[in-house]
Curated annotation (Swiss-Prot):
Family: Belongs to the protease inhibitor I13 (potato type I serine protease inhibitor) family.
GO biological process assignments: defense response to fungus; killing of cells of another organism; response to wounding
Gene Ontology MF terms in the entry: serine-type endopeptidase inhibitor activity
Protein name: Trypsin inhibitor
Keyword Disulfide bond in annotation: yes
Disulfide cysteine pairs (residue numbers): 8-65, 49-58
Pfam families tied to this protein: potato_inhibit
Protein origin, superkingdom: Eukaryota
Function of the molecule: Serine protease inhibitor which is active against trypsin. Displays strong antifungal activity against a number of phytopathogenic fungi including M.melonis, A.cucumerina, A.solani, C.glaeosporioides and P.capsici.
Keywords, sorted A to Z: Antimicrobial, Disulfide bond, Fungicide, Plant defense, Protease inhibitor, Serine protease inhibitor
Site (Reactive bond): 61-62
């Protein structure tokens, strides 16, 4: 398990403890993974990101401490990469 003490604020950094990475979810269904992430770290929101999506949260390069991108494949919606905060 990977834990970090980071919370983004517009004026600086505050700390909290929460899970930041979910390698065990690679190969699972995206919706199941998103629900697990939301349950295990209430400070973040999981966003499903299929290939070639136009969803803004999936296409930006900004780092956000309250978002976890869940990259899924087109066939079956299976998680293809370790979901991490950012």
């Amino acid at each position: 398990l990977i834990y970090a003490k980071v919370e983004c604020l517009t004026t600086g950094v505050r700390t909290y403890v929460g899970k930041q990475s979910w390698p065990e979810l690679v190969g699972t269904k995206g919706k199941t993974a998103a629900a697990t992430i939301d349950k295990e770290n209430t400070h973040v929101t999981a966003v499903l990101c299929p290939p070639l999506t136009t969803l803004a949260a999936c296409r930006t390069f900004d780092f956000r401490c309250d978002r976890v991108r869940v990259l899924i494949n087109r066939i079956g919606g299976v998680v293809t990469k370790t979901p991490t905060v950012g």
